[in-house]
């Protein structure tokens, strides 16, 4: 029997909370996206994240954890071999990526591939060299990501096939190539994405609302802008408070991230980090820490368990619904 009628999963894209044990293998040493932002800025105006337990989970600067947090919180390790957006999101919904996606950083894409692409689309390709994706072109609000189709079925497919709503906000639809999505909303910014989520919260549906807020990553993490990142977290917190007020008693809110992107670290790439897991419902009997988990996939498995849906064959993860 389901515990929650609607589940909102909000991905604060790149808000990692400290280096994983294997982070050095990915070229990341002593990385900590949220911790280093707090260290540099000392304080952030984030009352809602604070009362949910974010600072109990990971504190720094002059910030203080909540005396009585109202959320259930822990950190999740990434089981997959990677630190990119698709790998992180796919793992949340049950897919473990063993082999990292191939990149073409040394010599660009093969000439024959570019020639075929130009032939098919009738346009010339520019760039084709290793460069920061936030520097070589202007990031516009209408930017569109072209991702690979997931390598297997996910929790999203299972939910949709069971007749449940799977509503995506932001680039979630792109990340999953529309697989398992019943309705998609594209966002012009992370603030807009939260406004869309608040609007969705006021409507009736049964199932999942899956949200990606990309500005943390695209505008501030990749560009190594600590202040911008911190201010983006503060903007999010304001809308988080509005959303929390509108949640129904049988709603569940989950906040998490897909990887790190430490704005104090060298280069412009993502960083291999633990991510937060913060769950909240008005029907919860108190908050506090729960056991650390070794995969992001507990998210998808927990959602499926809540709705009595079987996870697709070949997926990973286990439910922690009883902890929530």
Each language-model region and where it sits:
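Feature captures the catalytic ectodomains and active-site-proximal regions of enzymes
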Residues: 1-324
């Amino acid at each position: 029997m389901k515990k929650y009628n609607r589940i909102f999963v909000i991905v604060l894209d790149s808000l990692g909370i400290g280096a994983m044990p294997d982070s050095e293998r990915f070229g990341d040493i002593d990385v900590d996206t949220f911790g280093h932002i707090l260290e540099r800025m000392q304080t952030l105006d984030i009352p809602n994240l604070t009362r949910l337990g974010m600072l109990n989970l990971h504190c720094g600067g002059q910030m203080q954890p909540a005396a009585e947090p109202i959320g259930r919180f822990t950190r999740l390790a990434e089981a997959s071999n990677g630190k990119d957006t698709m790998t992180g999101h796919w793992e949340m919904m049950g897919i473990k990526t063993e082999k990292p996606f191939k990149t073409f950083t040394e010599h660009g894409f093969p000439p024959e591939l570019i020639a075929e692409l130009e032939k098919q689309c009738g346009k010339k390709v520019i760039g084709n060299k290793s460069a920061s994706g936030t520097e070589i072109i202007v990031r516009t609000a209408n930017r569109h990501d072209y991702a690979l189709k997931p390598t297997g079925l996910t929790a999203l497919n299972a939910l949709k096939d069971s007749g449940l709503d799977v509503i995506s906000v932001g680039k979630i639809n792109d990340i999953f190539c529309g697989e398992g999505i019943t309705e998609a909303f594209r966002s012009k910014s992370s603030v807009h994405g939260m406004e869309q989520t608040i609007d969705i919260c006021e409507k009736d549906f049964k199932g999942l609302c899956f949200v990606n807020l990309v500005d943390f990553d695209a505008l501030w993490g990749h560009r190594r802008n600590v202040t911008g990142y911190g201010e983006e977290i503060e903007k999010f917190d304001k809308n988080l408070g509005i959303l929390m007020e509108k949640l129904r008693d049988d709603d569940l809110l989950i906040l998490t991230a897909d990887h790190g992107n430490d704005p104090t670290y060298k280069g412009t790439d993502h960083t291999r980090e633990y991510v937060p897991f913060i769950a909240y419902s008005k029907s919860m009997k108190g908050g506090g820490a729960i056991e650390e988990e070794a995969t992001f996939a507990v998210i998808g498995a927990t959602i499926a368990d809540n709705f009595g849906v079987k996870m697709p064959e070949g997926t990973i993860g286990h439910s922690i619904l009883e902890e929530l």
